[in-house]
């Protein structure tokens, strides 16, 4: 496996892979890789001939008071995991490499997708995501790109972007990977104290209970979100940002009664750490 840092090197690697007729899988990450990322890289390795993992803590998706400087950076460990899972190249550019101009060119999905859920408190976040992913798509020219369902709102934005900008690739969205105790894998879990980690288990428990309500026939979104909110509020260390349901695709307002496919998403702070989780509620 090769570790590379420049756009020129990545272009060279991709040109060689294309010349050999290899299919390319891209796994965009911000590093601090865990089993969730490992599952994406393994899927990319299974479905493509040549796998690129990008490791880039993208400054444009962090707001002024967010954790850009504190975000974990573990490139050596990331490379070991990527290699073990079958990556051919790890692309770890500097911010200057990815944003060469003094002024920026933005790729932005408009409408509801970037405004609801996390978009209310992180107004520039999704613009940063769609811009950096566009750059990575242009550089790696993948046949398939891999993302986790945990970042469901990001996935909806990227699906819209791929469709609207005619990117010739398939977005592969892989299931949420959880710890044995149910907590969704996240690079930010490393910030949690032991007590906060235990408290955060209320997220997966409350989503599981909501899914059971839905499967038992409940179709009133307000009743489901109220039940989840009540569950989470029983945990004294929790500080809820949102508990909401939107229709899929596109995070449209939910119908009452609920029909089709719907996303139940939560964002909750434990101490200073904000965690997200979700479950899709749909007819079997």
PLM ranges: what are they?
Residues 227-284:
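Phosphate/ribose-recognition catalytic cores of enzymes acting on nucleotide-derived substrates
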Residues 2-237, 246-250, 280:
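Nucleotidyltransferase catalytic core that binds NTPs
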């Amino acid at each position: 496996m090769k570790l590379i840092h420049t756009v020129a090197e990545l272009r060279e690697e991709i040109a060689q892979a294309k010349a050999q007729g290899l299919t390319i899988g891209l796994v965009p990450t911000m590093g601090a890789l865990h089993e969730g990322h490992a599952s994406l890289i393994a899927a990319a390795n299974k479905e493509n001939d040549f796998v690129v993992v990008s490791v880039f803590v993208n400054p444009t998706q962090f707001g002024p008071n967010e954790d850009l400087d504190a975000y974990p950076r573990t490139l050596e460990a990331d490379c070991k995991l990527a290699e073990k899972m079958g990556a051919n190249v790890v692309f770890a550019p500097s911010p200057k490499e990815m944003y060469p101009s003094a002024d920026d060119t933005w790729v932005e999905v408009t409408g509801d997708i970037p405004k609801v859920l996390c978009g209310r408190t992180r107004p520039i976040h999704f613009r940063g995501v769609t811009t950096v992913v566009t750059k990575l798509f242009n550089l790696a020219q993948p046949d398939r790109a891999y993302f986790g369902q945990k970042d469901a709102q990001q996935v909806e934005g990227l699906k819209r972007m791929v469709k609207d900008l005619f990117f010739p690739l398939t977005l592969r969205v892989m299931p949420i990977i959880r710890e044995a105790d149910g907590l969704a894998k996240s690079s930010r879990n490393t910030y949690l104290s032991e007590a906060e980690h235990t408290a955060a288990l209320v997220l997966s428990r409350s989503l599981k209970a909501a899914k059971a309500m839905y499967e038992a026939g409940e179709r009133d979104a307000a009743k489901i979100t109220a039940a989840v909110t009540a569950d989470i509020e029983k945990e004294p260390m929790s500080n809820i940002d949102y508990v909401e349901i939107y229709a899929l695709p596109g995070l449209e307002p939910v119908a009452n009664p609920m029909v089709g496919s719907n996303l139940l998403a939560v964002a909750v702070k434990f101490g200073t750490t904000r965690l997200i989780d979700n479950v899709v509620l749909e007819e079997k």
